[in-house]
Swiss-Prot record:
EC number: 2.6.1.52
Gene: serC
Subcellular location: Cytoplasm
Function summary: Catalyzes the reversible conversion of 3-phosphohydroxypyruvate to phosphoserine and of 3-hydroxy-2-oxo-4-phosphonooxybutanoate to phosphohydroxythreonine.
Reactions accelerated catalytically: O-phospho-L-serine + 2-oxoglutarate = 3-phosphooxypyruvate + L-glutamate; 4-(phosphooxy)-L-threonine + 2-oxoglutarate = (R)-3-hydroxy-2-oxo-4-phosphooxybutanoate + L-glutamate
Record protein name field: Phosphoserine aminotransferase
């Protein structure tokens, strides 16, 4: 059966070569006589898998030596609750910049554990733009400033790293990590659920400047303590080994493809095709996001009415273009163009958009 183009926002499309390698190695892996999902996470064989995944991720993202890397079970929402527990001292505030749905989720998760303050909120403008950093109201002694680098639902993306002075900048990079070069040294911490650009759902990556692990009060429960996870090489408890293995395969694939510089080029080309189809449609397709902050990863757009939205989703699925229905919070259509989406997928979508407009416009 021919694989369709999967535009799902997450879990998202994975490289076919990675899936086929995982398929081939599922029953018996690397000559050990058992599947990778059956061997001990503390065996020499799996420890080598884990070490290779970290080494390749460090190479892919140019992670400085003074930053620790954690591979954690669960997703970004869990991390959002753990950030204040690990990095905010009692009575200390933390600043949040709200640029979409996931920014709102981040502050909601943190609020029970820290004085979570809104430094800027783009909701008053309909989440169509990102307030400039110079306009943010930052607390001078804040534990950190939190941003969402790319909003998958509303389709806005920080195109430059904001300047926050000496305050640690924390960022949710779940949907844009490894999509272009990133100067990690400008951040105190970045994190990402794997299920968009790094691999399957169920595992996340946390990259943190080591000195930050030492300066704040620690959670009472060791399992929530990031310093403990770093000290135990992300194996404080049994990790999701299959997910970790697949993440490692995906990261290695990205390196083999040319790394983040190459994916930046590809992603710009893919986004240009879809935005070009929107902007050239004379209003039949609408994306209202300020062009300077349009997401390259997630492109939401709307047709003239909801009936056409539904017809677009139905006909596109029949044409082999999957998961284009917009998020329930906003409706419309959404195309996610993560690293594993080939240029041919973006071109097929742009062609379909033109054809659909010709027939229904």
């Amino acid at each position: 059966m021919t694989r369709a183009f999967n535009f799902s926002a997450g879990p998202a499309t994975l490289p076919e070569s990675v899936l086929r390698q995982a398929q081939a190695e599922m029953v018996e892996w690397n000559g050990v006589g058992a599947s990778i999902v059956e061997i001990s996470h503390r065996s020499a064989d799996f420890m080598a898998v884990a070490a290779a995944a970290e080494a390749d991720l460090r190479s892919l993202l140019s992670i400085p030596d003074d930053y620790a890397v954690m591979f954690t079970a669960g997703g970004a929402t869990t991390i959002q609750a753990l950030l204040p527990l690990n990095f905010a001292a009692p009575g200390q505030a933390a600043d949040y910049v709200i640029t979409g749905h996931w920014g709102k989720t981040a502050i909601k998760q943190a609020s029970p554990y820290v004085d979570a303050r809104i430094a800027a909120d783009a909701e008053t403008g309909g989440f169509l733009d990102i307030p400039p950093a110079a306009s943010w109201t930052l607390s001078p002694h804040s534990a950190y400033v939190h941003i969402t680098a790319n909003e998958t639902i509303h389709g806005v993306e920080f195109r430059d790293t904001p300047e926050v002075g000496t305050l640690p900048l924390f960022a949710d990079f779940s949907s844009s990590i490894a999509s272009e070069p990133l100067d990690i040294s400008r951040y105190g911490l970045i994190y990402a659920g794997a299920q968009k650009n790094l691999g399957p759902v169920g595992i996340s990556v946390v990259i943190v400047r080591r000195d930050l692990l030492e300066r704040a009060g620690q959670p009472r429960a060791d399992i929530f303590n990031y310093a403990s996870h770093v000290a135990r090489d992300s194996m404080l408890n049994t990790p999701p080994t299959w997910n970790w293995y697949l993440l490692g395969l995906t990261v290695k694939w990205m390196l083999e493809q040319g790394g983040v510089q190459e994916f930046a080029r590809r992603n710009a080309e893919k986004a240009a095709l879809v935005y070009g189809a929107i902007d050239g449609a004379g209003g039949f397709y609408r994306n209202l996001i300020t062009p300077a902050v349009r997401s390259r990863m997630n492109i939401p757009f709307f047709l003239p009415d909801e009936q056409l939205d539904a017809l677009f989703v139905s006909e596109s699925k029949a044409a082999g273009l999957l998961a284009l229905k917009g998020h329930k919070a906003v409706g419309g259509i959404r195309a996610s163009l993560y690293n594993a989406m080939p240029l041919a997928g973006a071109q097929a979508l742009a062609n379909f958009m033109h054809d659909f407009q010709q027939r229904h416009g």
